[in-house]
Amino acid sequence: MGFVMLGIASLTPIGINAAMIGMVAHGVITGLLFFLSGSMAHTYHTRDMGRLGGNMKLLPKTGALLGFTAMASLGLPGLAGFWGEFMALLGAYNPLDGLNITVFRTSMVAGAIGTVLTAGYLLWMLQRVNLGEPSDEWLDKDLHDADVYELSAWIPLVVLTAVSYTHLRAHETWS
C-alpha cells in the first residue's frame, strides 16, 4: 500500500492511476493469499511454516496457486501487482511541479528496496512451504487438495490477477 500512497502523493495522472490499480490489485492478490493460507491451515491444522514443506507434492493445486499468487504479490511483470508499483514509481520520478523532487526520488529508491525485500521473503516462504520433501508427519495423513468449491472461489481471483490491465489505457497518461 506504500506504492498507493506514493502514487497519490505525486499528484500526477499516472500516480493516481497507479494508486487505483494498486488498490484493486492489492485487494485481489491479498484476498487470494488469505484464501490459500486459510485452506492450508485447515488442511494441516497448523500455521507453522517450519512443519510444512513439500506442499507441491502433497497439495499440487494449492501449491501451484500459492506460487502464482506469491509471484503476483511480489510484482512479477505482467501480473496485477506489477502495474500499480511500476506506475507509482514512474509518477514519483516526475511529481507535480512544486513538489520536492529529492523526496520523491528517495521514496522511489526506498520503494525499490522494499520490492526486493518483499521478493526475498515471499521466495523464502515458497521455498519452505512448497518445495522440498514433505515432513514425515504428513505422509500418512489423508490431506485434501483444493476441491471444486475452493477452486470456484479462487479462479475468478486468479483471472483478475492475470489480467494485464493494459486495457485501462494507462499508457496515455505517461506523457
Predicted regions located by residue number:
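Functional transmembrane alpha-helices
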Residues: 1-143
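Interfacial loop-to-transmembrane junctions
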Residues: 138-154
